[in-house]
Regions:
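A surface/extracellular/periplasmic glyco- and lipid-processing/surface-interacting theme
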Residues: 35-93, 98-269
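C-terminal motif of bacterial Sec signal peptides marking the signal peptidase cleavage site
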Residues: 16-20
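Positively charged n-region of N-terminal signal peptides that target proteins for export
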Residues: 1-10
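Bacterial signal peptide processing site
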Residues: 22-24
Length: 269
């Protein structure tokens, strides 16, 4: 954004000087010098903070904060329950898709050590745009026509498409297709290396979220009867969240029961 502002500023200054006609020969040179000065200042300003995780806002090493996240399309139907690796995600977006169901985009800053992540499903345009905002490497299996025409075929996102690239996903035997497509941490690393995608953010990338860096106040649920149970929406799968006073977390339920991770049985919170 700052680079774009610098460019617009330089163009505006050049136009003003040319149409103002003071010293005709000096105007282009002045515009060039001022544009260069603005660009130099911009370069100094766009070095992003690398002391915090860009997905959680929590303290992180420079290496951890510089690593690009992986965004994985996860199915959210009863036929695909339980999901695997869902509680390891730092950020989860839930959007509606066709047929009155929803689907997840799970974003991971650290996806290591998992033998099974899924079930993986196809992309929609708005999921892919969200992955772009996070500078994520996008894992999915196929997608809508709009996703291919407007994003994937134009190379706007680094994506690992199981419909096109084989070898980094597998079908499990515990459920029927198409609800049984999974991947693993090692498989993701392998396909990223094979496709030659960068694994670190550019120095100027500052993240998609803004966090309060100086929050010394403990967050509590004061007189939280009205917020003890939160109903997200009434459509299928009718999820709701229940506040746990002991750990200060909201635990998710859907399909009439706790939403758990198939890896270890932990509940989504």
């Amino acid at each position: 954004m700052k680079r774009r502002t610098a460019l617009l500023l330089a163009c505006a200054m050049a136009c003003t000087m040319i149409t103002g006609c003071g010293k005709k020969e000096e105007a282009p040179q002045q515009a060039t010098e001022q544009a260069a000065a603005v660009e130099a200042d911009t370069d100094a300003d766009v070095i992003a903070d690398r002391t915090r995780n860009l997905l959680t806002g929590l303290p992180a090493t420079e290496e951890e904060a510089s690593k690009r996240p992986v965004g994985i399309m996860i199915e959210n139907t009863q036929s695909a329950m339980p999901s695997y690796g869902i509680t390891r995600a730092d950020v989860i977006y839930e959007f509606p898709v066709e047929g009155g169901i929803t689907r997840f985009l799970a974003l991971y800053s650290d996806y290591s050590g998992m033998d099974r992540i899924g079930s993986i499903r196809s992309s929609r345009e708005y999921f892919a745009y969200t992955a772009i905002a996070y500078d994520a490497i996008y894992v999915h299996c196929g997608g809508s026509i709009e996703t291919y025409n407007n994003i994937l075929d134009l190379g706007l996102v680094d994506n690992c498409d199981a419909r096109i690239k084989s070898g980094f996903t597998y079908r499990s035997s515990d459920r029927k297709s198409p609800h049984n497509l999974s991947t693993s941490s090692e498989d993701i690393d392998s396909i990223i290396e094979k496709l030659g995608y960068a694994t670190e953010h550019d120095a100027s990338y500052a993240g998609a979220l803004n966090f309060n860096k100086d929050n010394d106040n403990e967050v509590t649920l004061d007189d939280g009867e009205d917020a003890a149970v939160v109903v997200a929406y009434q459509a299928h799968p009718k999820p709701w969240f229940v506040y746990n006073e002991e750990d200060g977390l909201y635990y998710r339920y859907q399909f009439g029961e706790p939403q758990v991770d198939g890896i270890d049985g932990s509940q989504v919170a």
